[in-house]
Amino acid sequence: MIIRFDNVSYTYQKGTPYQHQAIHDVNTEFEQGKYYAIVGQTGSGKSTLIQNINALLKPTTGTVTVDDITITHKTKDKYIRPVRKRIGMVFQFPESQLFEDTVEREMIFGPKNFKMNLDEAKNYAHRLLMDLGFSRDVMSQSPFQMSGGQMRKIAIVSILAMNPDIIVVDEPTAGLDPQSKRQVMRLLKSLQTDENKTIILISHDMNEVARYADEVIVMKEGSIVSQTSPKELFKDKEKLADWHIGLPEIVQLQYDFEQKHQTKLKDIALTEEAFVSLYKEWQHEK
């Protein structure tokens, strides 16, 4: 499943004194099975971009193509329904949208609306919940008797229960404790590597971006100013400063190390494990 943006612009409240163009002339493509991160300052157009992916917003100009379905500002909702079934959207603080009295009912709400096999959806959701550290009897429990972090994970899995091909998540770990953050991010990565799902992550956490993403899209003032690998992105400190994007902690550590020892390691480390490997290699060659 490929998503392509061709010259996409979106204007809020068009034709009024309050109109605001949130994204303009966006051209990009999301390939099946890759992990994308979208980064940029607040107001750079990230959320507007992802809402155009499954036509929660329709382009003011330009086209969004999802496989063989082309979406314009004129496309009727009945033609978009197959797209929405295949793209799971998890917005910020999704726990605020929970409303069913048991986890099981929460899990089958989306699949029921799309007339999916409910037993398959329940089994799939239960497996994902177990991966996130829940007990076996979680399906009979009330989400409203759980902690905020548990409710967040329940809300995320309620979207994943529809088994979408593309998973779009907006700051999914904001406010979570470190263990829950790791659980959520590892689950998303496993869905990419084990089930060939496309992950599109909005995040301000460059540590997450460095560790998990295959490709990073940088947005500034409604435009894409860069689309590259994490390693290439974090090489250019001047551009990062101009875009107001910080360095991951491990990359900053590497730059500090190189400055202190007046050396240059052979590669940029995006994880602690990679840095240790580069450090050992440097020691061996010293």
UniProtKB/Swiss-Prot annotation:
Pfam families named among the record's database cross-references: ABC_tran
Superkingdom of this protein's organism: Bacteria
Subcellular location: Cell membrane
The protein's enzyme class: translocase
Ranges for domain ABC transporter: 3-246
Keywords from the named record: ATP-binding, Cell membrane, Membrane, Nucleotide-binding, Translocase, Transport
Matching Gene3D superfamilies: P-loop containing nucleotide triphosphate hydrolases (3.40.50.300)
GO MF annotation, one: ATPase-coupled transmembrane transporter activity
Annotated TM spans: none
Annotated ATP binding sites: G40, Q41, T42, G43, S44, G45, K46, S47
Its EC number(s): 7.-.-.-
GO cellular component: ATP-binding cassette (ABC) transporter complex
Membrane topology, record value: Peripheral membrane protein
SMART domains documented for this protein: AAA
Function of the protein: ATP-binding (A) component of a common energy-coupling factor (ECF) ABC-transporter complex. Unlike classic ABC transporters this ECF transporter provides the energy necessary to transport a number of different substrates.
Family indicated by similarity: Belongs to the ABC transporter superfamily. Energy-coupling factor EcfA family.
Subunit architecture: Forms a stable energy-coupling factor (ECF) transporter complex composed of 2 membrane-embedded substrate-binding proteins (S component), 2 ATP-binding proteins (A component) and 2 transmembrane proteins (T component).
Name of protein: Energy-coupling factor transporter ATP-binding protein EcfA2
Organism: Staphylococcus aureus (strain MRSA252)
